[in-house]
Regions:
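A glycine- and small-aliphatic-rich helix-loop capping segment at beta-alpha/alpha-beta transitions
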Residues: 46-56, 81, 145-153, 201
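N-terminal glycine-/serine-/threonine-rich phosphate-binding loop
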Residues: 1-32
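Glycine-rich beta-strand-to-loop/alpha-helix junction loops that act as flexible
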Residues: 34-39, 132-136, 187
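Class I SAM-dependent methyltransferase SAM-binding "motif I" and its flanking Rossmann-like core
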Residues: 130-174
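ATP/nucleoside-binding phosphotransfer catalytic cores, i.e., glycine-rich phosphate-binding loops
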Residues: 180-232
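Glycine-rich N-terminal segment of FAD-binding domains in flavoprotein oxidoreductases
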Residues: 26-51
């Protein structure tokens, strides 16, 4: 487990923001997949302010999502809606660089549309960087324990939250694993126990998608704050 521990969640998101600056200055478009959750909100707020908002060449960055809930962008549950409110409304970014899951659409229709967009824009299925979170149950994106097909050859899948039954669309495990780089951004004391378990137990003996999903030909890393890493 390749872990980097930061003093606070803010330090972790500052590091990611600094890397956005570097990625944005490459001489080709860069495809980044974002995550929902509380720590990414901190990242989006940080990116929307100086110095990052000015230093980043937004025209070069294309944004996607690991998953989203099937709700309209105005719904507080929408991962895309959060980024729009906290980041996109505050910067100049071309509309065509934003590749959202359209949560207001009928799920099967949207699944097909989203897969077509993915195939057209990233024909080899290789993302430059996928930023993921992890729930206390070990899920990542909307890939939940005991209900994820790790061999699904599709690009995306309709998923149902095991408790609320809420419908989402998620990238598949296989698509995520093709990325050049996967960063799990995990913060807070509530994640300490499961991180310890992932560090000390072979992934094949665990039900957690976050323990199993790793970049096949790239880098997999865990950005943690001190609270999350306290048992490691």
């Amino acid at each position: 487990m390749n872990t980097i521990t930061f003093p606070t969640a803010q330090h972790a998101v500052e590091k990611i923001a600094q890397e956005f600056v570097i990625y944005s200055q490459l001489n080709h478009p860069v495809h980044i997949s974002l995550s929902g959750g509380s720590t990414p909100k901190l990242l989006f707020k940080t990116l929307a302010k100086a110095p990052y908002a000015e230093q980043i060449n937004w025209k070069n960055l294309h944004f996607w999502w690991g998953d989203d809930r099937m709700v309209p962008p105005t719904d507080s549950e929408s991962n895309y809606g959060e980024v729009q409110k906290l980041l996109f409304d505050h910067i100049q970014i071309p509309a065509e660089n934003i590749h959202r899951i359209r949560g207001e659409n009928e799920p099967h229709f949207e699944l097909k549309r989203f897969e077509e967009e993915l195939s057209a824009i990233i024909p080899n299925g290789v993302f430059d960087w996928i930023i993921l979170g992890m729930g206390t149950d070990g899920h990542t994106a909307s890939l939940f324990p005991h209900q994820t097909n790790f061999d699904d050859e599709n690009l995306a899948v309709i998923a149902k939250h095991p408790e609320s039954g809420q419908i989402r669309i998620s990238k598949t495990a296989k698509l995520i694993e093709q990325a050049k780089r996967i960063t799990y951004l995990v913060t807070g004391e509530s994640k300490a126990d499961i991180l310890k378990e992932i560090q000390t137990t072979p992934a094949e003996n665990l039900p957690y998608p976050a323990a199993k999903i790793k970049a096949k030909n790239g880098v997999t890393e865990w950005y943690l704050d001190k609270a999350a890493a306290k048992l490691l």
